[in-house]
Amino acid sequence: MIEEHTKIHTEEGHMETFITFPEEGGPFPTIFFFMDAPGKQEELHDMARRVAATGYYVMLPNLYYRSTEHFELDFETFSNSGEMFELMSSIGNRMIVRDALTMIELAESDPNADSQNIGCIGYCMSGPFALSVAAAYPEAVKAAASIYGVRLVVDSSDSPHLGFNQTNGEIYIACAEFDDYVPPEMVTQVSEELSNSSANGRVELYEGVHHGFAFPGRGEYNKEAAERHWERVHALFDRNLK
């Protein structure tokens, strides 16, 4: 596997990005792997590697680059959780859509990347980012996955559900049964909004598990659910990008 750390130059700063892809067989379909709130840490690098190993060019950017070059939540003491919440509140869907354009441009310039077949995946904070990017760039983004994504249906002009009709790619939304950030009524609402739109996709409720079930280094990890999510994500990307 090839791995590199690069800085993508945007109009708002320098976005440090982890890129990984196989040594042979390219160009590879491109995956935008958007980090969750605790930051771009090694756990996410490993998850990006898992996707890349199946034949993808994966980009994992630091979405907090406007404020800091690097942030990782201290999971032992949570002493910097206040900073995390400040960083979370400093970014939004429109910002990430702008960032995604620079990521597309980088992919276009790299012969190892297939920039015409892009998939997006986001977890928690970044679930709505993945869906928003898919709606903003419908010709390039062929698949998008939100894994226990928050704020998918909100009273805002950039709410992700409003982009369903503009999305050409297939959508997959995974929700945990027990989730303090995603109440059952939002799961029902996003399911209805997706069903009533022109988008191709589905919402799947993972019964018996909690928000965060896919992260192997965290307390809510559930191996069975995590592996099911990987099965769904790999199938989604293979079906639409290869």
Specify the residue positions occupied by each region the protein language model found:
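N-terminal cap/leader regions of alpha/beta-hydrolase-fold enzymes
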Residues: M1-K242
